Amino acid sequence: MTPLVGAQTTVLSLQNGIDAAERIGKVIGVDHAIGGATWISSALEAPGVIKQMSQFRRIVVGELSGGISPRVETLVEAFRPTGVTIEATDDIRKILWTKFVFISSASSLGSLTRLPMGEYRAVPETRAMIVSLMKEVMAVAHAQGIALDADVVEKSLAFIDASAPHIKAS
């Protein structure tokens, strides 16, 4: 990929996790990488055909170093006509960890139970388990110096509760 990166190239990482953009930056140069988080539910329907499984589609982007740069603003403007809700943040690391509280817990519980969110959210024991998982990830974030909002667990649970019953976390 490095030979394709020019002076004006920007690569946006929308991968789940907390360090994908940093890893990309190590390969192509940190000045070319932008961090991002996305909330979307989709499934591979056939080779090359991706089906959106819900109405939510949100992207948050930001510079790894913090702040909102002109290239982040340009990226946001480029996405606007697509119908995807997109916003810039001056603290992408906080956003990535906030999503990680949700995705790591929901994905782990989905893998363990082999159930969609609608089924495991309704069982008191698995609901308690997801809260415990979220609090553990939140503690790791705090240990890494990331100041997450105090209500991140409650907001993550509200997102799960508002999701269609058949949705699975990736």
Region roles according to the model:
Residues 3-4, 27-32, 47-150, 154:
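Internal alpha-helical scaffold of NAD(P)-dependent oxidoreductase catalytic cores
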Residues 42, 95-96, 157-158:
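Short secondary-structure capping/turn micro-motifs that flank functional sites
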Residues 7-8, 82, 163:
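Structured helix-beta-strand junction loops
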Residues 9, 69, 169-170:
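Serine-centered coil/turn micro-motif
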Residues 1-49:
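Rossmann-like NAD(P)(H) cofactor-binding subdomain of soluble oxidoreductases
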Residues 153-161:
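Long, charge-rich low-complexity segments
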Residues 161-170:
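Short, intrinsically disordered, charge-balanced linker/junction segments flanking boundaries
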